[in-house]
Amino acid sequence: MKLPEALGSIHFVGIGGIGMSGIAEVLNNLGYTVQGSDVAENANVKRLRENGIAVTVGHKAENIDGAEVVVVSSAIKRDNPELLAARAKRLPVVRRAEMLAELMRLKSCVAIAGTHGKTTTTSLVATLLDKGGFDPTVINGGIINAYGTNARLGAGDWMVVEADESDGTFLKLPAEVAIITNIDPEHLDHFKTFDKVQEAFRTFVENVPFYGFAVMCIDHPVVQALVGRIEDRRIITYGENPQADVRLVDVDLRGGITRFGVVFRDRAGTAEHRIDGLKLPMPGKHNALNATAAIAVARELRVPDDRIIEAIGGFGGVKRRFTRTGEWKGATIFDDYGHHPVEISAVLRAARAATEGQVIAVVQPHRYTRLASLFDEFCTCFNDADHVIVAPVYAAGESPVPGADSEHLVQGLRARGHRSVTALKGPEELAGLVAGLAKPGDFVICLGAGTITQWAYALPGELEKLG
C-alpha cells in the first residue's frame, strides 16, 4: 500500500526547516492538503505561503485543528504544544524521514548521503537527470539556484533526495541508488561513537535492493574501508584514486572554474571510456569529486555524454555554497554553509586556488558541542586563510561548554601558528575589520550554519558606507 490520496490535512510542526519545507512543497504539489507552523518567519515560510500553504508563526495547540496527520522533525522537542495536542487527539505522528520515505516509494530513487557534500551532489544529480530528460522529483537540503527552491515535483519516474544522517533516520529511506561522499566524525551526540556512524552508513548501502547500486568515494579512507566490508551489493567507486571505477582526472582549479575529465573502467580493467572537457562553474576539487559522483549515476542511467558535459557546464550551484554576495573595491564577498572543519578546509583550499589575492575567513562556529568535540581540527582547518576573523559561537539552543568558545578558538589558532587571527564581538564590527584587511582581488568568505549568512549579504553594503 502506498500513500493514500485521501489522507486529510497534513500538519508540519517546524515547516520552515529546509528538509520539512521540501517535503511539504512536494506533497502540496501532489494535491495533498498541507498546513504548518514554525517559530519564526523565514524565506522557506514565505515560499510555502506563495504556493498556497497556510503557515502559522508560533507553536500553539490550536494550530493542529483540522489536521489528520502531524509531521515533526527531530528538532521538535517532546513538550512542544502541537505535538502534545496531536498525541492527546491520538493523531498519527510521523517523523520527517518517514514521510520522505513514503514519497520515495512513489518513484525510483537516488539518495545522497555523506558527512559533507550531500546538498551540492544532490543538486548535481538532479541537474544531470534533468538535462537527460528524466524530469526528476527533487528534495534537497539546500536551495538549488536553478529552481529557486529546494524541492520540485517532476513528471518522471525518478526522485533525487538528500539523505540526512544526523539522527540515523536516513536508514528508513528506500533507494535504488545510494551515494556516499565521505564519512567523518559528526553527529556523535546521536551516534555516541564513530564506529556506530560507520555502521549506519554500511546499513544504508546494504538497504539498497539487489538490482540497485551504490556509488562510493574511495579517496576517503573510511569509505574505502567500508567498500571492503560490503559483499552482496553492486558498488561503483569514484575518486582520484587510480583504483576507482570512475576516476577524476586532469583537474585544473584556476580562475574559479573547475576543469576536469572522468575515466570509466570496468572491474576487469579491459574497457575504458572517457569524458573530457568538463567545466564546472564553481571552484574546488571537492566539488569536482561531487560532480564525479553525479556523473557516475548519470552514465549508469544512460544519460549521453554531450548532455553530461552541457549539464555540468550550466550548473547554477546551490545557495550558501560558495555563493557570491557582492564586491567592494575589487574584493569579493562570499557566503558558505561550511561549519565542520573538513568543509571549512575544503572551501578555503578552493578559494586559495581560485584567487591570487588574500583569503579572508570570517567564521561563526556552530554549536558549542561541535566546537568542543572537534576543537583540534578547528584550530588547524584555517591554514589556507591569510586572515581569520572569529565571531561568537552560534549556540543553536545549546548551553555553553567550558573551553569551547570563540576566545579559546582564537587562542588555539594562534598557538598552532596562525599569523593573523582576530576576535569579533558582533556583526556591527565586521565591516570595519574587513575594510582594514581587504585589497583588490581578495576573497572574503563568511563561514557557518547560523546567522552569519545575513552578515554576508549585508557586508557589501556596509563596506560601501565606509567609503
From Swiss-Prot:
Its EC number is 6.3.2.8. It is an enzyme of class 6 (ligase). InterPro entries: Mur-like_cat_sf, Mur_ligase_C, Mur_ligase_C_dom_sf, Mur_ligase_cen, Mur_ligase_N, MurCDEF_pg_biosynth, UDP-N-AcMur_Ala_ligase_MurC. GO terms for cellular component: cytoplasm. It is found in: Cytoplasm. Pathway: Cell wall biogenesis; peptidoglycan biosynthesis. Pfam families: Mur_ligase, Mur_ligase_C, Mur_ligase_M. SUPFAM superfamilies: MurCD N-terminal domain (SSF51984), MurD-like peptide ligases, catalytic domain (SSF53623), MurD-like peptide ligases, peptide-binding domain (SSF53244). The keyword Cell cycle applies. One of its GO terms (molecular function) is ATP binding. GO terms for biological process: cell division; cell wall organization; peptidoglycan biosynthetic process; regulation of cell shape. Keywords: ATP-binding, Cell cycle, Cell division, Cell shape, Cell wall biogenesis/degradation, Cytoplasm, Ligase, Nucleotide-binding, Peptidoglycan synthesis. Coiled coil: none annotated. It catalyses: UDP-N-acetyl-alpha-D-muramate + L-alanine + ATP = UDP-N-acetyl-alpha-D-muramoyl-L-alanine + ADP + phosphate + H(+). The keyword DNA damage does not apply. ATP binds at G114, T115, H116, G117, K118, T119, T120. Cell wall formation. Belongs to the MurCDEF family. This is UDP-N-acetylmuramate--L-alanine ligase. It comes from Azorhizobium caulinodans (strain ATCC 43989 / DSM 5975 / JCM 20966 / LMG 6465 / NBRC 14845 / NCIMB 13405 / ORS 571). The gene is murC.
